[in-house]
Amino acid sequence: MLGESREEAERIVRAAREEAERIVRAAREEAERIESSSLAALSQASRNVLLSFQDSVTRSLRAIISMETAQAYDAGVLRELIPRVVSAWVQAEGDKLELILSPADLRTLEGVFCAALQEQLSAGVELRSDDCLTAGFRIVPAEGGSYYDFSAAAVAQLFSSYVSARVAEVLSLLRRSCDVFLLLPYNAATISSMRRGASFALSGFFGLCATFLGSAGCCGAWKYLVVSRAGA
């Protein structure tokens, strides 16, 4: 009787231990699943935010480039530049061409160009305006079919393409340097909660992002923080 009671007690203890181990194992597996799922979601969110940030930076830079390029094509620059360009063109390609300016620039500078390009104008160079042009100029060869675009919009697009590629390259390098990249609202609670959870380290890119976003007016009064998982 005593032996049976001891065996029953051992069986109960063994069953309880196995059940406890099963519960612990299941809890560990569930925790790992949740962690893996959370990291995957965070990584996807970080990629989405990074792409959004890249678009925002690119749009801001394009706006700046367009504004600065248009301002650079002032009357003084055109007064000096266009006679040189037209003279060089005539020597290399012939004197049958159209010089197209914005209506405002043509009104302002027509007298200047008529004096500076008198010989070329008498030989076949024509001046005209195009309402679609806001700054800069275009040269249209006599045979037509194509034109050489030195308008502010075309030059700005050229610079913007280069800048867009450089922004993408820089952010791509940054993204590859850490497995989690995220712009977060910056406050004490955010920092505290991150330090209590998975180990995070502040990125040195924070200053650049916060400064640029603030100056570009993309986030108003918010400050943003770039974080990467520690050891990444």
Swiss-Prot record:
Biological process, per Gene Ontology: ATP biosynthetic process; proton transmembrane transport
UniProt keyword annotations, A-Z: ATP synthesis, Hydrogen ion transport, Ion transport, Transport
Transmembrane residue ranges: none
Claim: Ion transport is one of the keywords in the record: yes
Family membership: Belongs to the V-ATPase E subunit family.
Function of the molecule: Produces ATP from ADP in the presence of a proton gradient across the membrane.
Name of the protein this chain belongs to: V-type ATP synthase subunit E
Organism: Treponema pallidum (strain Nichols)
